[in-house]
Structures are given as structure tokens and as C-alpha cells.
Amino acid sequence: KSTLLFALSGIDGVDGGKIVFDGKDLSEFGETELSDIRRTKMGLIFQQPTMLKSLNILDNIILPSIRGNRKNIAKVSEKARTLLKRVGIAELETRDTTQVSGGQLQRAGICRALMSSPKIIFGDEPTGALNSKSAHEIMDIFSEINADGTAIMLVTHDAKVAARTERILFMLDGKIVSELKLPKLNGSDIERRVEEVTAKMLEVGI
């Protein structure tokens, strides 16, 4: 599943077929161009956000945006602070990455992914290392981001996470074996959705 996500984002190449993003075949671009596309139009969030321990939370968030161009550092920092406030960790901007919880670090990772106002966010098990409360809060943030018009694609093994989405592809041994479409989430029906996703997972042998 992670391999598919890396292919869709252009990190890994593919042996056949085409991956079309924003109307363009990614295989037609070189690594420099693909890197620019990921930096400006895609956001990537992983199970364990990669942060530099030598920098504080704010500096880690703005680093990709100012690499090679520090002229707009004030504007970039202002945007980062707005995002930190949005995800509820504005007070942590000067903290070292070792001084925050896993959930707080993941929120910082989301801020970093949003700095370029991406068209799509890819999440590779973004809640996998979090407790249930933090995972629920992270999914709430994803729901808000999606409502603002950003597409989100997640890789997860958690039925509770999958049940918060509207389209689920079930993969087994590298192949899509089933699909489930759900209506827009209504908070009151989450338990039924989890049951439906779990039943489908059992049906296909996941």
C-alpha cells in the first residue's frame, strides 16, 4: 500500500501504466521537476514525521518553503504560525521536536505539508503511531482540510480511520481486491461505518 502511495506521488517509478496528476503524466518528468511538483502541489505525511532535532517546530515547518530563497521568510513564518494555530499547537512553535508528543509532532507535520497549499495530501499511516484520542483529532483536522477543497489519500490498516473517508480501496498482495463507497460522514453514524468497513475487510481476507 505504501509502495502505491509512493508511486502516485512520483517518489517511486512504475513499470507500466500511467500516473496522471493535474492532467500530466508524471513519467514525462525528470526527478528535479517531480521534486518541484511534490514541493508545490503535493503534501506528504508519514507515520513518523521526519524533523530535524537541531531546529524547533516552527523552523522545521518553514524549512522546505525557504530552501534556496530566504527573502520571504517573514511571510512564510506568518503562514506557518497561522497553520499552527489552526491545528491547535500555536504555543509550541519554539519547542524542540523532542519536547512534544507524537500527536503534536504529527500536527506539525500536517502544517509543513500544508505550507504550499497543495492540491492533494498523501498520508502513509499518519495515525499509526498515535493513541485513539490523538488519531481522532488528526482525522478531524484532515476532514477540515478536505472540506476546504484539498484531496486527501490515506494508507491505513485501521478500520476506524478508513470509516471516516468516502471511498476505500482494499488491497491484498499488491492488488486492489474490493472497493467501498460511503456517504459524507455524519458524526452519529461512525459506529455503523466502522462495522461496514470491518465486515468488508473480513470478507476480502485483510
Named regions from a protein language model:
Residues 55-63:
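Short coil-to-helix segment of the ABC ATPase nucleotide-binding domain corresponding to the Q-loop/switch region
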Residues 115-119:
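A short, proline-enriched helix->beta-strand linker immediately N-terminal to the Walker B motif
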Residues 62-75, 86-87:
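ABC-type ATPase nucleotide-binding domains, specifically the catalytic core motifs of the NBD
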Residues 17-25:
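Conserved ABC transporter NBD signature motif
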Residues 9:
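Helix-to-loop junction immediately C-terminal to a conserved catalytic motif
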Residues 121-124:
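Catalytic Walker B motif of ABC-type/P-loop ATPase nucleotide-binding domains
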Residues 96-100, 104-106:
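Conserved ABC ATPase signature
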